[in-house]
A protein has these predicted regions:
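Sec-dependent N-terminal signal peptides
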Residues: 3-12
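Sec/Tat signal peptide C-region and signal peptidase I cleavage site
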Residues: 13-17
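Predominantly soluble domains enriched in secretory-pathway, periplasmic, or organellar proteins
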Residues: 18-418
Length: 418
């Protein structure tokens, strides 16, 4: 009888304190913006075929996902109104109010391995002719697209051609500006009523890769190579002066660190406190050996690689930092049965704590603002996987996931626009 009484007393407490919903919820209203590259099937599934005759049939797409406290995910995938490439970065940009998503597309394919598709005939049109035709979407174009994330039809509100190879776009911490990295320039834009306006174009040394903006709003770390296939990818330090970006120096590896730069790197992320950057030693050319995570100390007057987490995965694709400042995660790049590395970055000895199962080729990865959820996008399986955060270092994979278009290549997170 006493046990039965205890049970009845306990049930209301659990129900009131942690009401379980039969769908994915978040502690506050948020929006996820996932982009998908139609080339992914050709690049991954048939890459060993030579000669290659796969024709590009799948349209690029994006998926908008609204999550909240009291409703199932509101999800819509739109095909054929943007172009985007899986060659490059797993993150793009969102306006600070969550109203607009921004994504780049480019014609860089790295090397022949990624360039075996037969494109539609209109791809033979010159860049100058493409710019004159404002309505056509070209797979091999250098463009930026702005998408309305709140309008239920999610129209493209603006698209512009760029005189460079725009691999990556990120929002500045000031919540107003956006920075775009090309091979030869940084571009600075401001967004007004869904349209981009260029503020500056900054000449920089040539390089192929990605970047991250320091939370101080005054510096940038990029990870770039002169030739992604044959020359090592190195981290670089930049300074933002007004709207211009100025190259400062290469970020050297301290002699005490047992690691080095390798070819085919390029992915990195700066911690929210601005003290460190996690840098992928190698993303691609899988099946060789395990790649390291290089750790840059950004508190130094001249930032330097001062630490390393050895042999994390056969290619490291993306990073996310938990709001607690103790835990970070890194996605590995196995194509089918994949891995998520959970990292302890709080101690003097950064390390891998454990691995969790992840869908193939994981790209974009983001924690929810409160840190109770982790979202991970998979191009191979067309889904956003969800992990629940239990404590400082404990993640568990949720059996529920969010369905998106095939070929996921980037994930952005922000507030729900009101």
């Amino acid at each position: 009888m006493k046990k039965l009484l205890f049970l009845f007393l306990f049930i209301p407490i659990v129900s009131a304190g942690q009401k379980l919903m039969p769908y994915i919820t978040t502690k506050s209203p948020i929006t996820l913006f996932s982009t998908q590259d139609g080339e992914t099937e050709g690049i991954w599934s048939f890459s060993v075929v030579n000669p290659y005759d796969f024709k590009l049939r799948a349209e690029d797409s994006f998926t908008v996902i609204h999550l909240g406290t009291d409703h199932p995910p509101i999800v819509k995938t739109v095909y054929g109104t943007i172009a985007t490439s899986i060659i490059g970065t797993p993150s793009m940009a969102m306006s600070s109010d969550g109203h607009y998503g921004l994504v780049t597309n480019h014609n860089w394919r790295g090397f022949d391995f990624f360039d075996k598709l037969i494109y539609p005939l209109d791809e033979s049109i010159s860049p100058e002719e493409k710019k004159l035709n404002k309505e056509t979407i070209y797979q091999l174009s250098n463009m930026i697209f702005v998408v309305d994330l709140e309008n239920s039809s999610h129209p493209v509100t603006h698209k512009i051609h760029v005189d460079d190879v725009p691999v990556h776009i990120l929002a500045h911490p000031d919540g107003k500006r956006f920075f775009v990295l090309g091979h030869n320039h940084f571009f600075t834009y401001i967004l007004k009523n869904g349209k981009l306006f260029e503020l500056a174009k900054s000449k920089i040394p040539y390089g192929q890769g990605c970047f991250w903006i320091h939370p101080n709003g005054e510096n940038i770390v990029a990870s770039r190579s002169k030739d992604w296939k044959s020359e090592v990818t190195k981290a670089e330090w930049f300074k933002i002066v007004d709207n211009k970006v100025i190259y400062k120096h290469e970020i050297e590896i301290d002699s005490s660190v047992d690691s080095n730069y390798q070819i085919m790197g390029g992915i990195l992320r700066i911690s929210p406190d601005g003290k460190k950057a996690l840098i992928s030693q190698r993303t691609y050319d899988n099946g060789i050996d395990f790649a390291d995570i290089l750790i840059a100390d950004l508190t130094l007057k001249k930032p330097k690689i001062t630490d390393v987490i050895k042999q994390v995965g056969d290619g490291i694709e993306s990073f996310a930092f938990h709001p607690n400042g103790k835990m970070a995660v890194a996605t590995c790049l196995e194509k089918r049965k994949n891995s998520l590395a959970v990292l302890d970055i709080s101690s003097d000895n950064p390390r891998v704590l454990y691995y969790l199962d992840a869908a193939g080729g994981s790209q974009g990865i983001e924690f929810s603002p409160e840190g109770d959820k982790l979202f991970l996008g998979s191009p191979a399986h067309g889904r956003i996987e969800v992990y629940d955060v239990k404590d400082d270092f404990k993640l568990s994979k949720n059996q529920k996931f969010i369905k998106i278009g095939y070929g996921h290549n980037s994930l952005s997170i922000g507030p729900r626009y009101r």
